[in-house]
Amino acid sequence: MAESGKEKIKWTTTIIISSSLKSYEVATALENRSHKVRYSDSVENGSIIFSLSGVAFLLMDTKECLLSTEEIFLAKIEKFINIHQNSFLVLSAALHGPEEWKLMFRIQQRFLGCNLRILPVHNTVNAINLMCTIAKTTSKPYIDSICYRMITAKAYIIEQSPVWKTLQKIKLNSDSVNPN
């Protein structure tokens, strides 16, 4: 299948999933995408780790967070971010109403300045798409390509920018007046 002159290559990677998620839809969905899924009892319950990309996701249901004590789920999140440098909290709710947004705000306040990013999702498909997109864009061949394209775009913008050209003319004119 060709797409704009290039063949589209299916991205697959190895994913370490907490054994607590083995019977959940999210694990099945990742397996169905042809990823190499490994289950582990040694990772935090509810975690999904894309080891080649260096990203980790902690899946939590907002209802469960709201029903449990704040100290319990905050301790779980803290343990997770202390282990994983590039961490995401995936908060799932069918509808993100006022209570769910208050919960996210409390978590953001508690972990302000930490390496935790919060992803509100509505369903499994939404969660899988977000996790795979983040993992794919942070994996080695893709991140190199993205960096190259950003550098190229920056160079093009600088080269074609009328503001940049005006600044260069001003600098050239000031250099001819000022002999230093």
Swiss-Prot record:
The signal peptide, as residue positions, is none
- Give the primary localization class: nucleus
> Is Nucleotidyltransferase among the key words of this record?
no
The record's subcellular location field reads: Chromosome
Which UniProt keywords are listed?
Chromosome, Meiosis
Keyword Iron-sulfur set for record: no
A Gene Ontology biological process noted in the UniProt record is:
reciprocal meiotic recombination
Q: Which GO terms describe its cellular component?
A: chromosome
Quaternary organization:
Homooligomer. Interacts with SHOC, SYCP1 and SYCE3.
> What's this protein's function?
Plays a key role in reinforcing the integrity of the central element of the synaptonemal complex (SC) thereby stabilizing SC, ensuring progression of meiotic prophase I in male and female germ cells. Promotes homologous recombination and crossing-over in meiotic prophase I via its association with SHOC1. Required for the localization of TEX11 and MSH4 to recombination intermediates.
Q: What is this protein called?
A: Protein SPO16 homolog
**Organism the protein comes from:** Homo sapiens
Lineage, highest ranks first? Eukaryota, Metazoa, Chordata, Craniata, Vertebrata
